[in-house]
């Protein structure tokens, strides 16, 4: 049995799972492509910093992790995306060590199939559907 050394790993908070989980070059069958696996937390780090222009400190706080851990995740994500774009690889998005951040609209939540606040992959909605 293996034991981890150091501090226990904490779950990274993400806003939601992405709607699209696969990107590939046009005109090449999937079977002929190498792929890069981008975890959900790596995608979230790119979303927060590169898409929403959050400073690293704020983005790390949103994900519930230290700035150092955030920087390592972001660096890994950028390297994978650059490799896929330059070398024509497929990007497969999935996995990781995460949980979906609470949306803070519990009291007003009136979800049918969709959230009026734009949270498309809500845990409460999933739990309600499975009951």
Swiss-Prot record:
Disulfide bonds: none
Domain of life: Archaea
Family recorded in the similarity comment: Belongs to the UPF0251 family.
Classification via HAMAP family: UPF0251 (MF_00674)
Name the record gives this protein: UPF0251 protein MMP0619
Lineage of source species: Archaea, Methanobacteriati, Methanobacteriota, Methanomada group, Methanococci
């Amino acid at each position: 049995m293996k034991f981890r050394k150091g501090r226990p790993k904490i779950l990274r908070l993400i806003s939601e799972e992405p709607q699209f989980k696969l990107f590939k070059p046009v005109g090449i069958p999937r079977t002929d492509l190498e792929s890069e696996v981008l975890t959900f937390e790596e995608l979230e780090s790119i979303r927060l910093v590169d898409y929403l222009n959050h400073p690293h400190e704020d983005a790390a706080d949103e994900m519930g992790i230290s700035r150092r851990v955030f920087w390592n995740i972001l660096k890994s994500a950028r390297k994978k995306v650059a490799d896929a774009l330059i070398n024509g690889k497929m990007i497969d998005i999935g996995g990781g060590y995460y949980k979906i951040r609470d949306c803070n609209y519990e009291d007003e939540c009136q979800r049918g199939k969709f959230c009026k606040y734009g949270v498309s992959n809500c845990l409460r909605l999933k739990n309600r559907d499975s009951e």
